[in-house]
A protein has these predicted regions:
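All-alpha RGS (Regulator of G-protein Signaling) helical domain and cognate RGS-like helical scaffolds
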Residues: 2-157
Length: 157
């Protein structure tokens, strides 16, 4: 009789649970927007920065572009019909010289990265699997960027 009880425990019970909800891509699209914004902001800030700061900002921009690419891939994988947001390129457009604004200060980049790290960290805590790992990695990278790579005396408050 013990074997029969174990056999029953091992068999699937289809009516006991509902399938998990399909993952929403909206949250990832928000992360994609943040990644693109951070990349553009770091690129713009690099224009007027001294050499060590310039190099760090260019690296931050490249990392955030990689995040945007990874998010775009994940959105396309999750979405049945990918939206136009997930098909956009991650290359920022270059403004004309007459319309160019002064480069943003380093503190703006740090603030933006901090907000992006916090957002990705919160979303990672409510996610699972690959998505949680991707978001956790993005949060860690943004945190390292503003606490280590861009630690040139910029105030982030």
């Amino acid at each position: 009789m013990g074997g029969a009880a174990l056999a029953l425990l091992g068999s699937p019970v289809p009516a006991c649970s509902s399938p998990p909800a399909p993952p929403a891509v909206d949250e990832l699209e928000a992360q994609l927007t943040l990644a693109r914004r951070d990349s553009e902001l770091a690129t713009a800030a690099a224009v007027g920065a001294s050499q060590p700061v310039n190099a760090a900002l260019i690296e931050v921009a490249a990392e955030r572009t990689k995040h945007a690419q990874a998010l775009t891939t994940e959105i396309a994988r999750l979405a049945v019909n990918p939206t136009s947001t997930s098909r956009e390129t991650t290359t920022p457009t270059t403004p004309t010289p007459a319309a160019a604004a002064p480069p943003p200060p380093l503190a703006d980049v740090v603030r933006s990265l901090r907000a992006s790290a916090d957002s990705a960290r919160q979303l990672a805590g409510t996610s699972s699997g690959y998505r949680a790992g991707l978001l956790g990695s993005i949060a860690a990278s943004c945190t390292a960027s503003y606490t280590v790579a861009l630690a040139f005396g910029a105030t982030s408050s």
